[in-house]
Amino acid sequence: VITALAALPIGDNARAANGAFAVDAADISEVGSCKLESWISTATNTDFSLVANPSCVVDIGKPVELSVLSSRFHSDGEWGNSFQPKAKTNLVPTGIGKVGFSIYAGGSFDALTGENLTVFAVAPATYRLSETMRINVNGGWLWDRIVDRHFLLYGLGWDWKFTDVLQLTLEAFGQAGQADRPSVTRPRFQAGVRYRPNEIFSVDLIYGRNIMGENANWITLGTTIRFPPPESRPARERTGHL
């Protein structure tokens, strides 16, 4: 059984790419900015997860987004806790009509024993069709250290900001490799709407299918609180904002 999921790296407890969405974009925020993403997910098979993911962007010669996701989850009748440190940096900036790239890497750990559960590395790519529409493609590698197996990670997402405050996201993602349960390597899907009334706060409502490899349906409610760097201009003024 896969036991961790961080951003695209997938498993049985948590993930964090763009809030509760699994497929990441190539962008990172400005140096000095921070955000707190949190969400609660519940499945038709009684699985459950509660996640908090604080992150900040620092300059260590190059802007790097550092985050530590923590989760409390119920899976296969058992409760558990994990945390997942991750570092992400942009390699090629995104822009309308061109492809941007980034890379991130990290791992997941059992919060009680400190045991290293997974190691992962993912390369997100983003193609912006316009100021209000983009396509995200993810590819990467996951090492499940519990069963000592390696997996290929993949993801495809589409974001459309169809009003000033509403954004639609559709995504398919998963992992390829040998697994004891067939559902672990079957594709996973999510569709959700983000309500973002201002640059500080947003709310996500997401429907998912098989998102932890358990062959169940999921409902997720998530929030993001953003803390921009001092004296920065609003994101919509800077970039056109998606």
Residue positions per predicted region:
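C-terminal segment of classical bacterial N-terminal signal peptides
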Residues: 5-13
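Transmembrane beta-barrel domains of Gram-negative outer membranes and organellar outer membranes
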Residues: 14-242
